[in-house]
Regions:
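Alpha-helical DNA-recognition elements
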Residues: 62
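N-terminal helix-turn-helix DNA-binding core of bacterial DNA-binding proteins
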Residues: 15-57, 74
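Basic, amphipathic "hinge/linker" alpha-helix immediately C-terminal to the N-terminal HTH DNA-binding motif
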Residues: 81-99
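Short, structured secondary-structure boundary patches
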Residues: 18, 73-78, 92-95
Length: 117
């Protein structure tokens, strides 16, 4: 067995990079239903994808700038306005393409990882 205790920060950084790459796909998928930032964070968390606000909100802005999400301000019950995000038609096309690509890559990696065992 390999002692990795001294390299744990490296593994944490690699895992963080891997998650960051998947977040675009996850956010687009979750925004099929209108979501505001915190509800999206909670929804992703329930599915095992933790994301902090410092990552989520810039990602939402970037996806909106790219035309993959739309947003609108809405007044919630007796509270401050919330910005709700929803996938756009262009975002739906991107999600379909990314989903196919994810499945292809996942199969390839499964084959590689199974080969190691």
């Amino acid at each position: 067995m390999v002692d990795v205790t001294h390299t744990i920060p490296v593994y944490e950084n690699l895992a963080s990079e891997l998650r960051r790459g998947l977040l675009t796909l996850a956010v687009l998928a979750e925004c099929a239903v209108e979501q505001y930032g915190y509800s999206l964070k909670q929804s992703l968390s329930k599915r095992g994808l933790e994301i902090n606000e410092g990552t989520l909100y810039p990602l939402l802005r970037r996806l909106e700038e790219q035309g993959l999400l739309t947003s609108q301000w809405q007044l919630a019950d007796e509270s401050r306005p919330r910005r709700y995000y929803q996938i756009s038609p262009q975002g739906q096309a991107a999600l379909a393409h990314l989903s196919v690509e994810w499945r292809r890559l996942s199969r390839a990696l499964d084959g590689l990882l199974t080969q190691e065992e």
